[in-house]
Regions:
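A short core secondary-structure module
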Residues: 173, 177-224
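A short, Trp-centered hydrophobic/proline-enriched beta-strand micro-motif
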Residues: 142-151
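A structural signal for short hydrophobic beta-strand segments in well-ordered beta-sheet cores
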Residues: 165-168
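C-terminal helix-coil-helix/basic helical segment that borders enzyme active sites and/or dimer interfaces
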Residues: 24-32, 296, 300-307, 323-357, ...
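Internal helix-loop-helix
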Residues: 49-143, 185-191, 340, 389-392
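Glycine-rich phosphate/cofactor-binding loops in nucleotide/flavin-utilizing enzymes
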Residues: 97, 118, 271, 373-399
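Glycine-rich beta->alpha junctions and the first turn(s) of the following alpha-helix
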Residues: 2-4, 10-11, 86-88, 223-327, ...
Length: 399
């Protein structure tokens, strides 16, 4: 893949029109945290038919699994069945949509991306049929919003080794205690996927088994903290979660077994990290695109010493570097799309490298955009300062 297809461009242009009509007029309220993002992402899904597509997809998946379990047939291997390849055929349109939105508000992307790509996806890959039936239909249409809770105050990059949130067996149930922080959708989530260590008396606390549970808001002992005030991404509520003897029945343990066939919670999370880090590259591309567009327009409109500033070599060099960054990140995204079409995914190491380069490139481009705008770049009305704040979050986000 070396360029966007005609279908991708149609999706991009349709998304651009939606943004101009439905999001830009409310951007100040969203970015200040005054407006909730959830009505906007639900409107987006409704407008593009994504809610209907999600409902149909989950219905078909559940019907297939019911039939398979009734006949006791083994599920097909994802790679041999071509599932990834089928996804890849449509992924470029999704990337076109997301990158366009990223140039305006990566917080909105994070809001639905975490709910679907991490919360619902974990239930989909690790849950039993009954668990999928219980939670996925409402999550896949955004009727309900999910959070995905791994990070803790003392366990960020060392997410599993330093994890202190734990469960201990209490009869047939589990009691959950601990704290999570920096949790996207945490303050408002209806459903929360929580990773916790099993306190089984093992002396090596770092190596204890990690289990994955699903909680619903309002459960006794669960406290969802208020949204943090952040440097950027204010359109995505982020907060803390507190667990004080939250009683969890066995049907809330994903897979309903402590010995999951796909490994423990560590393996589940690592699989999600690949998608999350590639997603950072897509958002980085959107920020770079928007910075470049704004800077080119400004360089044509702004005059100094009787000349458009775009005629000065220093400005031309800045714009050229932005274009190089755009090409590099776009090529990484395109390469990933090609691999997906071929039925493969990047390794965790490759996804991490893509994430590191693209987020750093987006941050450098956005900071150069602020500098190119000069004093105006420091003012909120010109938007490049928001892009700089959002871009910096991508260097931290997703590890």
């Amino acid at each position: 893949m070396i360029e966007w297809s005609d279908s991708d461009i149609i999706v991009r242009d349709t998304m651009r029109a939606f943004i101009d009509k439905e999001i830009r007029p409310h951007l100040d309220g969203l970015e200040s945290g005054e407006l909730s993002p959830y009505p906007f992402v639900r409107k987006l899904f409704s407008e593009f038919g994504l809610d209907v597509m999600g409902a149909e997809a989950i219905r078909a998946m559940l019907d297939e699994q019911r039939a398979r379990e009734a006949s006791r047939a083994e599920p097909e291997d994802e790679k041999t069945s071509g599932t990834l390849g089928k996804m890849g055929a449509q992924a470029s349109m999704a990337v076109a949509l997301i990158s366009e939105l990223a140039g305006v508000s990566i917080g909105l992307i994070s809001t639905f991306g975490v709910s679907l790509g991490l919360g619902a996806a974990t239930i989909m890959t690790r849950g039993t049929l009954a668990q999928k039936e219980r939670w996925l239909p409402e999550l896949m249409t955004l009727e309900k919003i999910a959070a995905w809770a791994i990070t803790e105050p003392d366990a960020g990059s060392d997410a599993f080794g330093g994890m202190k949130t734990h469960v201990r067996r209490d009869g047939a149930d589990y009691l959950l205690n601990g704290q999570k922080t920096f949790i996207t959708n945490g303050p408002d989530a209806d459903v929360i996927v929580v990773y916790a260590k099993l306190d089984d008396g093992e002396a090596d606390k770092r190596g204890r088994k990690v289990l994955t549970f699903v909680l619903d808001s309002g459960m006794p002992g669960l406290t969802q903290g208020k949204a943090f005030k952040k440097m950027g991404m204010m359109s995505s509520p982020t907060g803390e979660l507190f667990f004080d003897d939250v009683r969890l029945s066995p049907d809330r343990l994903l897979g309903e077994t402590e010995h999951h066939s796909s490994g423990d919670g560590r393996d589940s999370a690592r699989a999600n990290f690949v998608a999350e880090r590639v997603g950072v590259a897509v958002m980085s591309l959107g920020i770079i695109d928007e910075c470049l567009r704004l800077c080119v327009d400004y360089a044509k409109a702004r005059t100094l010493w009787g000349k458009e500033i775009g005629r000065f070599q220093l400005i031309q060099l800045k714009l050229a570097k932005m274009e190089v960054a755009r090409m590099n990140v776009q090529n990484m995204v395109f390469q990933t799309l090609e691999r997906l079409k071929a039925g493969t995914l990047p390794s965790l190491g490759e996804a991490s490298a893509i994430k590191w380069y693209s987020s750093e490139a987006a941050t450098e481009v956005a900071m150069d955009a602020v500098q190119l705008f000069g004093g105006n770049g420091y003012m909120t009305e010109y938007r490049v300062e928001q892009l700089a704040r959002d871009a910096k979050s991508l260097m931290i986000y997703a590890g």
